Amino acid sequence: MAPAIQANSNGTMNVNGKCRDGHTAEQRNVMDDALPIEITVEERGKAFAKDPWAHEYSVSEQALRDQERLIDQYHHKVLIVGAGHGGLLFAVRLLQTGNFGINDILIVDEAAGFGGTWYWNRYPGLMCDTESYIYMPLLEETGYMPREKYASGPELRANAERISHLWGLKRRALFRTAIKALDWNDAQGQWKATAQGLGKLQQVKLSADFAIIATGLYASPRIPDFPGLWNYKGPVFHPARWDYSVTGGTPERPEMTRLHNKRVAIVGTGASAVQIVPQLARHSKHLMVFQRTPSGVDQRDNCYTDKARWKEIASTKGWQRQRMENFNAFIGDPKSAPAVNMVGDRWTSMPSYSMTIGANGITKPGYQDEMREMDSIRQGKIRSRVHAIVHNPARADILSPNYPGWCKRPCFHDDYLAAFNEPNVDLVDLQGKGSISFTATGLAVADTQYEADVVIVSTGYTSPKDRSSPGSRANIAITGRGGLEMERKWESGLSTLHGVMTRDFPNLFFPGPAQSGVCTNQTYTLDQLARHVAYIMARGIQQCNGQAMVVEPSEEAERAWADQVVQRAGDSLTAFAACTSTSLFSAAKMTKDQIMNAARLTTWREGIASYVIELEAWRSEGTLQGLEIKRLA
């Protein structure tokens, strides 16, 4: 049967025969750098682009009329692309300014409901890997208490729907609609959007004064162009489009009864696979795990939320932000971390991950050496944990990470490693053995054939490390003033103001990550950016007495910000040269000019706390320094 490869949240799935350096998939390990293309443009790919969850969202005649009303309205004050945590936070923070009403906002998403990554990802074992008390947005505002320290996928998805209900956003959402292009009309001071409806609605034209790209960092599932992929006769799917018709079960009750007599192969051992493998081990007749680079897996220690303890946690105003920033400090500013570790998880015992997200003092002499020493000790403990749990020493060696901990996002799970003790689980090590290829009945590595009834391709997502523009990551062709394509600006030496807006793309906002702050808790980052963007938009409206206006950074301001980003990066990016898998940066492979351009495309390397201080200081001045604001006639 045809592979059940599905489209991403903007209609694409990633299959490509060439890597970034121009080598073919056969010349390199194809799990490294496959790039996305739209398989929906091919006849054979059309069946793979379906939303596997759309049938759960019944569309009444009233709902259809509401959607048609939003389209007929045509012009909207604010267009938000994306209905995940980012889109919700941008909408809520705009409403809280008092300068925007609910009818000013239009949210567009290809999904049939709210949730973003938690809408699409519904694989068995799905949970967040950051404490839910700081990861789930707007808990203080909603008063909701998470059921567990690490919330499940269904709970996270339900929370997104809850937020949309409390703020009345559902009636302002245009679902099952993919924005394909955004074009700036300078004469009208508006963004013109071309969208493709995926249900009864077909091509849609929209207009907006402001546009916000909030499609997330990991919106696009990535599948390498494995040789022979299209010849395989069994079902193939990505975890982000889990096919329960093949496995049995549901997201809420993932009892995969249809796998009891099946040979299952899962390719990849990243964050998704770490959660999936224990579930497959329980339900499959035979499970084969294909690994290129092992994940560093520490314990998670999940538990149910104690109500009495929750009352203590959520008892004071501002508690969630305080807890978020306490968590951030233990990773991004370890030398000045508070006396009390509020979260107390395994993330907060990994300050060396600051080499990825940035930290106070990261460019100072000796910082990298100090982090390498700390990381070496931690990685040694991770390897010891593998050998303590996995009975077979040779298998334990294969599962042990031998690279700096900042090279690959760490994982946390209590059952993953133990799954490799089960007699029905095999581990296939791909290191030094060439690439995977598909046969009609399974997979092949070098001269060895692996028969499989089902293949799950857990090869991750298009990463922000790819240094592409917000438009490219969202699969939207964005064209600014004078026909300037956003991708061209990113390639030719990026400049932004605060990582959220860029000149010649007026009234357009995006949540970094280039030239903005980042942290391991993406919800905190998104909330800070949403607050900042809401402030800029509201102040611009106020300055123009509520009239239509255009706002963008001055050339000098965004150049100065880019220079600050480069200055704060220093030589910190060289830490990634030791990474064995695809890295953010490798000095050995880049010219001096390329290194400088990479530095402009990186994040605020001084850490999220420093970045937020910069934003708050800028806002406290109240002058909107560096912005050009013009009222339209």
Swiss-Prot record:
Binding-site residues for FAD, renumbered to this chain: 117-120, 129-130, 135
Which GO terms label this protein's molecular function in UniProt? flavin adenine dinucleotide binding; N,N-dimethylaniline monooxygenase activity; NADP binding
Q: Name one Pfam family in it.
A: FMO-like
Q: From the UniProt record, give the pathway where this protein acts.
A: Secondary metabolite biosynthesis; terpenoid biosynthesis
How does inactivating the gene affect the organism?
A: Impairs the synthesis of anditomin but accumulates andiconin.
- What note does UniProt attach to the cofactor annotation? Binds 1 FAD per subunit.
Entry keyword ATP-binding: no
| Keywords of the record | FAD, Flavoprotein, NADP, Oxidoreductase
**Which cofactors go with this protein?**
FAD
Q: Which GO terms describe its biological process?
A: terpenoid biosynthetic process
Q: Binding residues for NADP(+), per the UniProt record?
A: 127-129, 269-275, 292-293
Enzyme Commission no: 1.14.13.-
Database matches in InterPro entries: FAD-binding_Monooxygenases, FAD/NAD-bd_sf, Flavin_mOase-like
Q: Does the keyword Iron-sulfur apply?
A: no
Point out the annotated site residues (description: Transition state stabilizer): 409
Protein role: FAD-binding monooxygenase; part of the gene cluster that mediates the biosynthesis of anditomin, a fungal meroterpenoid. The first step of the pathway is the synthesis of 3,5-dimethylorsellinic acid (DMOA) by the polyketide synthase andM. DMOA is then converted to the phthalide compound 5,7-dihydroxy-4,6-dimethylphthalide (DHDMP) by the cytochrome P450 monooxygenase andK, which is further prenylated by the prenyltransferase andD to yield farnesyl-DHDMP. Further epoxidation by the FAD-dependent monooxygenase andE leads to epoxyfarnesyl-DHDMP.
Family the entry assigns: Belongs to the FAD-binding monooxygenase family.
Please identify the protein, giving its name as recorded.
Answer: FAD-binding monooxygenase andJ
Q: Which organism is it from?
A: Emericella variicolor
